[in-house]
Amino acid sequence: MEVAEANSPTEEEEEEEEEEGEEPISEPRPHTRSNPEGAEDRAIGAQANVGSRSEGEGEAATADDGAASVPGAVPKPWQVPAPASEVQIRTPRVNCPEKVIICLDLSEEMSVPKLESFNGSRTNALNVSQKMVEMFVRTKHKIDKSHEFALVVVNDDSAWLSGLTSDPRELCSCLYDLETASCSTFNLEGLFSLIQQKTELPVTENVQTIPPPYVVRTILVYSRPPCQPQFSLTEPMKKMFQCPYFFFDIIYIHSGPEEKEDDMSWKDMFAFMGSLDTKGTSYKYAVALAGPALELHNCVAKLLAHPLQRPCQSHASYSLLEEDEEAGEGEATV
């Protein structure tokens, strides 16, 4: 019978010395509820980025992230955009109630039958906009019945046509009795002043942790030749745009290459409207008036997402497969 020999004292001492010489390797903790995303294992230097937008998360970011850049856009003397904000705010990604103010342009360009409908015939932007607004309101109501909607019509001045209501039928009842008119000016300042009078922005004790009782979102459907807007950025207006619970989405239906080169380009107007969003949280779309109506519907469908839960526009992806990303983005990009 063989008996295993015990390690000699010399061997034990050598093993102890080797163990003491080894540096303990700390393995990162797994991603659990108590340690989401390995938060405790992040480097100290990364803490300086707390509150910054990461990989298109649904938080506020700088204007560079969400601004819809248009090639060839040259600033005009009347364009005085607010400087890009360096303050980055992280808000809770919650589906709180929305107060959606739909601003519909009633300029005569909206009645020109240039959009190509599904059956190949020509229709005007007003008819398509009316249908897509109704679809948007009814779909949002099905998602959350606490959402409220208001309708504002924009001519030379703005008029509050339907007050905030959670009943889609109330808004749709006055949606189709609209007529276009020739508009010489665009009083953008008056539009925002009207919104400020009719709504109140929520305030929370802690923006990063406490969900707001509601958010205010303005959706402007705009279609008219580029013109110098009546606008000056007042202090109350600046506070409204800086509020993390205010969103200004834009759908610009433009005439495209039909415009003369000497005149102000639609790209200038589109870039100016995009510059008003200093937080980078709004969505902006440009659609050609002579294109298919499907593109307009695609843009409105992308606005169904809750502003606090959607990523910044530059990170948004609507394809299921990676190889389809380019084709998917082209559906609503003109």
Curated annotation (Swiss-Prot):
UniProt feature, compositional bias: Acidic residues: 10-25
Identify the PANTHER family for this entry: BRISC AND BRCA1-A COMPLEX MEMBER 1
The GO terms describing molecular function are: identical protein binding
Entry protein name: BRISC and BRCA1-A complex member 1
Query: Which CDD domains does the record cross-reference, listed alphabetically?
Result: vWA_BABAM1 (cd21502)
Keywords of this entry: Acetylation, Cell cycle, Cell division, Chromatin regulator, Cytoplasm, DNA damage, DNA repair, Mitosis, Nucleus, Phosphoprotein, Ubl conjugation pathway
Chief localization: cytoplasm
Domain note? The VWFA-like region is similar to the VWFA domain. Its presence reveals similarities between the structure of the 19S proteasome and the BRCA1-A complexes.
- What family does the database annotate? Belongs to the BABAM1 family.
Record-listed Phosphoserine modification sites: 8, 34, 54
**Which biological processes are named by the entry's GO terms?**
cell division; DNA repair-dependent chromatin remodeling; double-strand break repair; hematopoietic stem cell proliferation; mitotic G2 DNA damage checkpoint signaling; positive regulation of DNA repair; response to ionizing radiation
On assembly, the entry states:
Component of the ARISC complex, at least composed of UIMC1/RAP80, ABRAXAS1, BRCC3/BRCC36, BABAM2 and BABAM1/NBA1. Component of the BRCA1-A complex, at least composed of BRCA1, BARD1, UIMC1/RAP80, ABRAXAS1, BRCC3/BRCC36, BABAM2 and BABAM1/NBA1. In the BRCA1-A complex, interacts directly with ABRAXAS1 and BABAM2. Component of the BRISC complex, at least composed of ABRAXAS2, BRCC3/BRCC36, BABAM2 and BABAM1/NBA1. Identified in a complex with SHMT2 and the other subunits of the BRISC complex.
Signal peptide span per the entry? none
- Functional summary from the UniProt entry: Component of the BRCA1-A complex, a complex that specifically recognizes 'Lys-63'-linked ubiquitinated histones H2A and H2AX at DNA lesions sites, leading to target the BRCA1-BARD1 heterodimer to sites of DNA damage at double-strand breaks (DSBs). The BRCA1-A complex also possesses deubiquitinase activity that specifically removes 'Lys-63'-linked ubiquitin on histones H2A and H2AX. In the BRCA1-A complex, it is required for the complex integrity and its localization at DSBs.
Q: Which residues carry this modification: N-acetylmethionine?
A: 1
Q: Which domain of life is it from?
A: Eukaryota
Q: Where is the composition biased (Low complexity)?
A: 59-68
Its Gene Ontology cellular component terms are: BRCA1-A complex; BRISC complex; cytoplasm; nuclear body; nucleus
Compartments, record wording: Cytoplasm; Nucleus
Positions of the region Disordered? Answer: 1-79
**Looking at the record, which segments are called VWFA-like?**
100-303
